[in-house]
Every structure is written in C-alpha cells, then in structure tokens.
Amino acid sequence: MSAPLHASAALAALVLVAAPLTATAQVNSFAQVERGRYAVATGNCEGCHTAPGEPSYAGGRGLETPFGTIYAPNITFEPETGLGRWSKDDFWRAMHEGKGPDGSNYYPAFPYPHFTKMPREEVDAIYDYLATLEPVRKEKPENELPFPMNQRLSLSVWNWMFFEPGVYQPDPEKSAAWNRGAYLVEGPGHCAACHTEKNIAGGDKASEHLKGGQLDNWSAPDIRGGEGGGIAHWSEDQIVEYLKTGRNEHTAAFSSMAEVIEYSTQLMLEDDLRAIAVYLKDLDSDARQPADRPGEPVMTAGAAVYFDNCSACHVADGSGVPRIFAPLSGSGKVNDPDATTVIRVILEGARAVPTKAHPSPLSMPAFDWKLSDEQVAAVASYVRASWGNAAAPVTADEVAALREALQPTVQ
Amino acid sequence: MARKLPPVDVVLVGFGWTGAILAQELTDEGLEVLAIERGAWRDTPTDFPTTTAPDELRWYWRKEMFQNNSRETLTFRNNRGQTALPMRRWGSFLVGEGVGGSGVHWNGQTWRFLPSDFVAASHNIDRYGPLPEGMTVQDYGVTYDELEPHFDRFEKLCGIGGKAGNLNGRIEAGGNPFEGWRSAEYPNPPMHMTFSQNQFARATAELGLKAFPGPSANMSRAYTNPLGCQLAPCTYCGFCEKFGCGNYSKASAQTTILPVLMKKPNFTLKTHNEVLTITLDKSGQRATGVRHVDLEGNEYEQPADLVIVCAYALGSTRLMMLSGIGEIYNPATGEGLVGKNYCYQVMSSAEVFYEDKYTNGFVGAGALGMAVDEYNGDNFDHTGLGFIGGGYIANWTTNARPIETHRTPEGTPTWGSAWKKAVADNFLKSTSVGAHGASMAYANNYLDLDPTYTDVYGRPLMRMTYDFTPNDMAMSGFLTERVREIAELMGGREIKLNPREGPYDSMPYQTTHNTGGTIMGTNPTNSVVNRYLQSWDVPNVFVMGACVFPQNAGYNPTGAVAALAYHAAEAIRTQYLRSPGPLVQA
C-alpha cells in the first residue's frame, strides 16, 4: 500500500469515530457561532476572563472588590479546569440564575444580575462560540475573601435581597432602538456594575442608577445622558464615536473603560452603539448641587502647578487637544463629585486605549514622584473649579489616602 | 557555541527609522519579520515623558540618549599620516541606540534633495567640466522622479509641515521655487514663525532671495497619519534635537509606525541583542542569516532568507566590513569599495544680537525656521567659483536650552563675570543664521577597520579618516559670505561670524549627518549596493541609511534616507519576492 492511500484510510477511520461529534458541529452553524462571538463582545467576557499575558478566556484574572479578590474562572471548554463538561442547561443556569452546575451561588462579581436579561438563544449562542475556542488547561486561583464572604451560602441572602432573574422585557412605549439600547446597557453590557453606586452589601443603589460608582480605586463617572446627567453635553454621535474609537471631542478612555472598548464596544455594530446612545440620552437626572469653590490661595497654587506641568498638553484654558489630549473643561471625570479618578490620574498617569480607529496608546506620565500631596490637591481643585467646571475641592488628605491605597502591597 | 534559532523570512539589523519602515512594509507583504536591536525598548510615556524629556543634563550632556561608547565607538584621525584614537565621548555627531535609533533625538528638518543632487557627477561634469583631482563624487543610480512618490509617502507618514514651492511643475508662491516637483502639498501647514524668522524673511527679500518655511516633522497641528497614528500639536518647548519628544509632537518610529507594527503577529522585536556578523554560505554569495549576542553573552544563529541592515550609516558600514561582504576600501591603491566616500556636512553660521528686541529663543522647535535655497546644489552658476555644491541658509529657532545656549558678542571673554553678564544680556535678544553645506566625496576621506582598538566583543572598531576638503572650504567660504549679507540686514546691533575652519574637529557638535561607506551606484565597480540598496555581492542583503549616499547634499538627510528605504521596500515587495536574486544585472 502506498503512503497516500494509507493516510486516507486512516482519515476515513477517524471520520467514522468522530461521526457523533460531526453531527453536533453541523448544528453549530457558522451563523450561530458568529452570533455567539458577537454576544460575547456585547458582554465583554474576554476582559474579565483573561489574565494579562495569558491565553484569552482562560481566566485567572483577579477582580478587586470591597470584599476581597475574586478570580474569574477559565471559560474555555477544557474538561478539567474549564467548561468542557458543562451542558447548555448548566451554562444557562449560570448566566440566568447565577448558579454553578452543583447549585452553588456565584459571587455577583460575575454580573449575572445583568446577564439574566439575556434570552436563552443568545446564551446558547455564547456557549456554542466558547466551544469553538482552543481549550486551555488553567486552574482558577482561590478567591481571597474573609469570613463570612467566603461562605457561598450567604449569597442566597444576597440574591434574595438584590437579584431578580428574568429576561429583558421591552417597553412597548419606547422605540426599538431605545429597547435595544436598554437591553445592551442593562443586560450584557452590565454598565451599572461600575457606573452605579453600591450599597453596603455590594448591591446597586436603585436611586443612583448609572450616576457613577467606585471600584478598585477608580471612580466611574455618571453616564446618564439626559438633562442633568453626567454626559448631558454629549450628542448621540459623540457617544457612538467614544464607544467605537475610544475617543471623542470630550475625552479618551483609559483604565477599566479602555478594556470595555477594546474587547467589547469597538467590536459592536454601529446600530447597537447608537441604540445605547439613544437609551443613555433618555436618562434624565436632577440638577447637581453646585459645589463650593476653593479659596483663592488654593486656586493660585493650583494654577501655578497647572501651567508648569499640565498646560503643554491640556492647554492653558483646559481645552486640551480633542481625541489626543483630553479636554479638562467640561470633562465628566473632572466634574465627578467623587475625585478619585482625577487624583489617581495625576498620581499615576493614564494611557488612552489603543483601538482599531486610533492605534496610538497616547499616555500621560505619572506625577506622584514630582508633586506633593498639597500640590496634587491644589491642581486637582484648580481644574475642578476652572473653565466652567464646578466640582468640590480636593484635600491633601484625600490625595495622601489614595496614594497610600495605591502602594503595591508587599506579598 | 551559538544556539540555532528557528528561521524567519526577514531579519532587520537595527530598529530605527529604516528598520521600522521596512518592518511595516514587509509585514504588510505577509512576511515573518524579526528586528534585532542592540539597545533598549523606548517609548514616549516610559522613556521620555514630558516630566523628564527636557532634562538637558541627563540626555545631552551626560549622553544618556546616545550609544554607549564604553562598549563600542569609532576611532578618528584627520588624515592617513596620523594614528587614530577612540572617540570616548561623542562630540561632533551623536549616534543613537535603542528602539527608534537616532530618529528619536532628531530635530525633524525633513528635506528632499534636489533632482541634480542625485546626478551630482554627470550634472556637474556636463556643466562645468571634469571634477577636480581626488574628488570621487558620483551619481546615485536613482533619480528624483523615481523617488518622488516615496518622499511623499514619508512626508505623509510624518505629517511634515511646510509649503510646496513646486506643485507638479507649477511654481508656488511662498514655497521653495528650487525644489523638485511635488505630487502633493505638504500634509500640514508650516510652523508658526517668530520674530527672528520674520527678520530673516525681510532681510532675504531685500536681497532678492525667496524665503520659505523649513519643512518640519514637529507638528504644526494635530495630525493623524495614514496608519491611524496620532501626533499632537508641537508646544515649541525646544527640546527636539538630542531629546525624545514627550508631547507626541515629533515624528519618530514611536509616534508614526510602532503603535500599528508592534501589534502584528508576524513581527517580532528583540532588544538588547547585538548582531555580530551576517553569516554567509560557503559560496560567500548568499547570506544565511545573522549571528547575534545577548547581554549575558549568549550567542545565537538566526537563519533568515533576507538580511536588511538598518544600523545607522556608521553601524551598517562596519557590519558589512566585519561580515566580509565586499572589499574594504584602500585609499593607497583605490581598490575596494566598502568604507569609500565617507562624507559629512559643512556648517557655518552668524549670530545676530539685538539691542532692544526680544527674540525669545526658548520658544523653539527642531524645525521651526525660514530658509533660502538660492545657494544650494546647482541652483546658482558655479563658473569660476572653484567648487561644486552648496547648502541652504536658514534661520532656525531650535532651542534656547540653558546649558547649551549662551551666545555672546564678538570680543566677550570665554569665562568669568564679563562672560556671565554677556550671556544674561543676550540670552533673550539673539538669533543665528546658518549655512547647511554639502559635503563632496574625496579619495582620502574614508572608513575602514582600526588596526588597534576593539569593542566589548573584541571586534575591531571602525576607523574614520576625515577632514574638510578643498571643495568644502571654498564652498563654505562662499556660503558664509552669503550668511553674513543676510545677517547684517536682520536689524541687529551687531553680528558675529562663525566660519567653518579646518581641520575638522570631532568634538564640537556639528551635525549627526554621517554619510557614505556602502555607497549606491550604477554598477558593482563603483558601488556597494545597487539602486534598490541591494548588495551587489550578496543579493539577499540590503543596506539602508545614509551610508548609501555617494556624497552628501546641502540638506538634512532623513527625508532622502526614508525615501530610499521606501523605494527599496517597494522593489523587494514587487520584484525581489517574485524572483529572489539580483534586481540589477551587473
């Protein structure tokens, strides 16, 4: 027998053995897998389920919560360490009810309170897509949670208090675009996970919905786009541009939002981004209370620090260079009542997300080694009270506390 | 014993401007490209952020921006009668090291050579008769018309600001009327000029000269290049030459190519590895790859189908010598070509001091200036002048960096309280007009391997034998007189002339425009590489950089270096890959 014939005989045997699997593969049509790939993008699964420098979706990334560090599991279909033995029903239960195959509760760091809004077909498509990924063997590190947070039973109480399973129900009074946007924002997009203030138990404060939150020493700004909202001055087009390219006339994305744009929104269809914009622009808020202006000595000191260190990029009048160096005038982050992000960016610098549209990772350098707590407080107070901005002053103590919190912990 | 690594399609030796250009072009072609860089990874926010970029002491005076010459340097002498000694501290030129190469610390003056510069030998012989004894000027083997699209490409990559003087053959007001035709206007408008440039424009107009804005790689406005990379408007801080730009305002590999290139799966960069030699097969006519060494001294064999040398003019020439590709030039016999036609740049200037006008030189940028081109190349009749070539004359306000900048009038003591007072009195009230003179090749100016001194790996250092030539001195004398005429009309209280005087001194900073050594040309008897920068001897080796210039024109070289690199890349993409072998038959 010649070698090629031998090879094809072996191939035939392989096909026979693999026949039942082939049947499954046929069900997972290209369209179904692509639907799943897109659904995964809408939920930014890759962002949390990928550790830096490790294979995508193999988990191991730690999410810092006020209660401790929770690690994202491996969601490739590796049988021992991933989802390889899960059925579609198991996967649905996880996404819809927040429970593992053994009935145990997940921590809501996994945003099932949002994913529950996704319909079964969408969740099945995600399952089918994840099944096509190269399986990676990778154990999930143990969560670092103190008692009683490490008792998963306590989560039943949490679920009873804060969680209501149920697929998104469209509002017939609203347009199709609004409903699509609401679904994406409240469902897979899980925007509230960062942008809504939490109660003491880590549940969303309903009255503060999308008015800004704090996570992992970052403050996420108010993203309500209606009257009185944090991005009331953004147009629909500007919201779409921001989500698509990571930049718009007002700002550039960095830190956690950089990930959201990199793995999620820049991959989404423009119609969907527009739907998100339509929904956000419909969320009105009460007008903010004007904040106290810093005293003149602080403004004078802040202006001096600003002109020496910041004005080359952000320009003397805070107008920045749109899409390159963030304008500070009118910035949602600068005007956030919670100054954490402003202080942190001055201390650590920031790196604008490189996207397909804007590949340059334009960065601001760190000033922690150069400016004292008093200087950081003065310049932060100055930018928060200049050029139409009207947010409360920052104190040197706040700067010192954040500086301390950002120190790398010695293992 | 060197460890053998898996083969790649292309290995690039050095990762500055030309390395980044070639990597971007050849990865687009689908090739697996590896760049090997002896220095470190460098990027704006990590290595020269605004908070440390303007550190004059660190970057320039303590030479942190440049090649570490305790590991490798050159030896230098003025002529063959002397014994060359190692340059233990950079002076007249500043060789780069690390990702981005010297293109990180350039000023950004981005010129096109004149059409006649590419045919300097035949053009001048036609017009003025035979070249003088000892002058070895020759044609490039490529014409301006062939390079035009590649100049254009580089200008768009960088976002060069300027004003066209010749748009498709039509002379445009406000631009350089002598330049070769351009297929398009500059992608950005000129920089904002200052008082000094306005005085220069007025003075040159009075003399009947046509001043135009210097072509600038410092951004005159926010710019997004064709790859999508973003550059920010220049802040005129004056820390360009000798410094990295912290504001993303100067075109460099980092700001124009790397954000896109570094994400490509078919591109790999290896830093802190030095290529020791290009390896050849037994025939000596085919490169098999390179041998390189890491910082721990481990050696590697890197097989590759194509080796492209992008290691700056001096490094590339030396690597060709150390690899035994071609014969090293010997001025005594005229034999050999590698190392021949080393050229430089012949600079002179005049300083202008004002009594009551502020020039505010601290508002500067590397390529902020106005220039005239009447006395460059063959833009004027050289009959009876005793030299060929010329240079542009410009008023740049590149900087007023406090340690470096201390213009003082004629007769000021060089130290002490009178000197200090003069520096203080004139710091804000002075400017300078410079001539950027060409450098014509002579048989006695050359590069070879030093017989005595070696680098950290025991390889011979390259030896530079160079002095200003009779052509240089006559040309510079002529240009300096033109500089004087202009300076005197700029409305100052007094001027001070700084003529170029020989012999060439390797210590005072002049320019980092080292050219020649692996010159290009029309056939293997007059050149090391052909018109596509391909080695005549080993056709799977290409050499990029100003080392291929047969002689240097009266302009800064980066524009021409990049255009030649794009021209070579196009030939590799469209011709060489289809049929690997010599692109020009000898």
Question: What feature does the model see in each segment?
Answer:
Chain A
Residues 193, 199-202, 206-319, 324-337:
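Extended non-catalytic domains of envelope/secretory-pathway proteins
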Residues 8-20:
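Bacterial N-terminal signal peptides
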Residues 69-85, 90, 96-121, 139-144, ...:
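Axial heme c-ligation environment in periplasmic c-type cytochrome domains
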Residues 38-50, 73, 90-97, 108, ...:
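C-type cytochrome heme c attachment motif
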Residues 34-37, 42, 50, 54-82, ...:
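Sequence context of c-type cytochrome heme-c attachment sites
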Residues 30-64, 159-160, 169-199, 204-212, ...:
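Sequence/structural segment immediately N-terminal to covalent heme-attachment motifs in c-type
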Residues 23-27:
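Boundary at the C-terminal end of the N-terminal hydrophobic targeting segment
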